[in-house]
């Protein structure tokens, strides 16, 4: 579960290191976001010569959460960190590589580009 002010890690090679959620998209009263949801993030820390700079605001897709995701068979998949992939205004990934595993739920959400770039799909 991601909400405003949640600290996040970047799971791509866009150049961002640390991000913070500034808005959960999808309605004015929506408080939490989970895997497969799109949020607004601000870059808090970035590497030099990266595609993104500190202070910039982007859309981001949540790919891993510590809360995890519950499957229909009752299993629960949890991760060690909260990670996102930065997206441009057309909701295409900014980076060209994805680091770490992603879940099958992204396939249902029609983010096939991110699923195909990921090294492992759980």
UniProtKB/Swiss-Prot annotation:
Supply the SMART domains for this chain: Ribosomal_L14 (SM01374)
Give the record's GO CC terms: cytosolic large ribosomal subunit
Among SUPFAM superfamilies, the record links this protein to: Ribosomal protein L14
Cite a single GO MF annotation.
large ribosomal subunit rRNA binding
Q: Which residues cross the membrane?
A: none
Keyword list, A-Z: Ribonucleoprotein, Ribosomal protein, RNA-binding, rRNA-binding
Q: Which GO terms describe its biological process?
A: translation
Q: Does the keyword Transcription apply?
A: no
**Which positions form S-S bridges?**
none
Known role: Binds to 23S rRNA. Forms part of two intersubunit bridges in the 70S ribosome.
Subunit text: Part of the 50S ribosomal subunit. Forms a cluster with proteins L3 and L19. In the 70S ribosome, L14 and L19 interact and together make contacts with the 16S rRNA in bridges B5 and B8.
In which family does this protein belong, per the annotation? Belongs to the universal ribosomal protein uL14 family.
Listed name of the protein: Large ribosomal subunit protein uL14
Top-level taxonomy: Bacteria, Pseudomonadati, Pseudomonadota, Gammaproteobacteria, Chromatiales
Q: Report which gene this protein is encoded by.
A: rplN
């Amino acid at each position: 579960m991601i909400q405003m002010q949640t600290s996040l890690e970047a799971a791509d090679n866009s150049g961002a290191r640390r991000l913070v959620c500034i808005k959960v998209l999808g309605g004015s009263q929506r408080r939490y976001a989970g895997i497969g949801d799109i949020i607004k993030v601000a870059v808090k820390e970035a590497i030099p010569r990266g595609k993104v700079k500190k202070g910039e605001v982007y859309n981001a897709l949540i790919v891993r959460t510590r809360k995890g995701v519950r499957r229909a068979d009752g299993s629960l998949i949890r991760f060690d960190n909260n990670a996102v992939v930065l997206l441009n205004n057309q909701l295409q990934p900014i980076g060209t590589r994805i680091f770490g595993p992603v879940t099958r739920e992204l396939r249902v959400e029609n983010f096939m580009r991110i699923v195909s770039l990921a090294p492992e799909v759980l």
